[in-house]
Amino acid sequence: MKKSHLVYLSFVFLLTSCLPFAPTEPIQVANPGEILYQESFADNTSGWDRVLNDGGIMDYDSGGYRILVRGADMNFWSTPPGNFGDVRVEADVTKLNGPDENRAGLMCRYQNGNYYFFIVSNDGFYAIGKFTGGQAILIGQESMVQTEFIEADGVNHLRADCIGNTLTLYVNFNQVASTLDA
């Protein structure tokens, strides 16, 4: 029997400056602390990926964004329309069913398949890393680290700050990690 993983997301992006590399599309600019992009998922044409295949589903659902992963060792993600630089990204994530050993999280600086990621699992672990050249690499840690701040059976409010080369993860309004990527 295949196990299912469901996650609902609600996003808020805050801009604090600009990317250090040349993007393929213009960077959206705002003053520090201003909301640059906010998504309620009420409009199913707002630009997020809609996928239905044997591996899973990504789609708008009841005012949220649902990600269902049907197989082990699979990753599904979607990014908002636009190009953002230094950001604060926030989302509420909920596991609806499936095992507690799972992953949900946030990304920043997605460019040509490369990005930073901030992940948590319902069994209480987190990690910060980057995906580059087809490889996932954890930054500042050798493996996922346990924290008491993750709610196994509830909503987890995640926040990721990508400011310059500093990457910071918050879980339920508590900073759990901060690291530098040189």
What is the predicted role of each segment?
Residues E25-L52:
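Extracellular carbohydrate-recognition regions
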Residues V69-G133:
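Secretory/extracellular carbohydrate-interaction modules
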Residues G134-H157:
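Short, aromatic/His-centered strand-loop micro-motif at the edge of beta-sheets
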Residues G154-T168:
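Localized edge beta-strand/strand-to-loop motifs within extracellular or lumenal beta-rich domains
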